Amino acid sequence: MQDPGHLQGPPLALDPPRRQRQERTVYTESQQKVLEFYFQKDQYPNYDQRLNLAEMLSLREQQLQVWFKNRRAKLARERRLQQQPQRVPGQRGRGARAAPLVPVAAASFPGGPEFPQGRGSWISPQPGPWGVLPAAEPKIYSLPRTWGGPECGTQEGLKAVPAPGPGPIPAPIPGPAQIPGPVPGPAPNLGPMSGPLSVSIPGPIPAPISCPGPIPDPVLGRTLMPGPGSLPTPAPGALWPQSPYASNLSPDTQLYPDFTKLLPLLDRFEESSLSTTTSQYKEEDGFVDKNHSVPRSLLDL
């Protein structure tokens, strides 16, 4: 029989041993003074120099190699800090901004707006310690009297408008107002309706027809009545479309009575007697002559 150990693979490799941390070397004051003295002479000593110095200080050569390496890094860090500008005390961290090196100059005249670098410059406000910009404070700027003149009624001071700060977002503007409909109310009582209403569309109203008066006859001296054939016939009305609500009257129906049937025909004898009586009456009164021309009172003048 085969050994079951041969069927299995090689044993799993164990975790590599961790590198032990080197203990921190503690130097005495006398050792530090000697190392500093040699560092001022040469910052990069070679192997032989380090070996001789290690025997003199009772140290290992590897310890001196690490000390010189750390001392060179410390010197480079100090030089880098000296080249950077000074920071405002109280602001620490990578996000802190450098303080302005140039102080803010005073205004040219009191009471006017402040322009540190000139009239065309602008200084942005510095944020607070929590990164919030301070609120704008209203200021009063006074203008000189010569600007507006003595006769002009200029104001003594103009109040600056503060910058808009953070505030609530205004509500959306409402849409166009709807026009309200008619106010519902009680409908007027029209009373009981006996039947369906018949709406009649009126036709064109004809003009009033005037009956012609008696026509005087210049030969016989009497008046003549016009016959039925001499009356003007009315024009036919416009045809209207048929509607179920229209009345039964047709457009051709005459809306006025026939005056010829109402007036009886006068005989010639009655006409002659009527005209003779009228002429005699005028002659007796003395106002109009037989020819009915003009009054006599006007001729005497």
Curated annotation (Swiss-Prot):
Single GO molecular function: RNA polymerase II cis-regulatory region sequence-specific DNA binding
InterPro entries: HD, Homeobox_CS, Homeodomain-like_sf
Chain segments carrying region Disordered: 1-27, 273-301
Keywords: Developmental protein, DNA-binding, Homeobox, Nucleus, Repressor, Transcription, Transcription regulation
Intracellular or extracellular location(s): Nucleus
UniProt similarity note: Belongs to the paired homeobox family.
Protein known as: Tetrapeptide repeat homeobox protein 2
Annotated source species: Homo sapiens (Human)
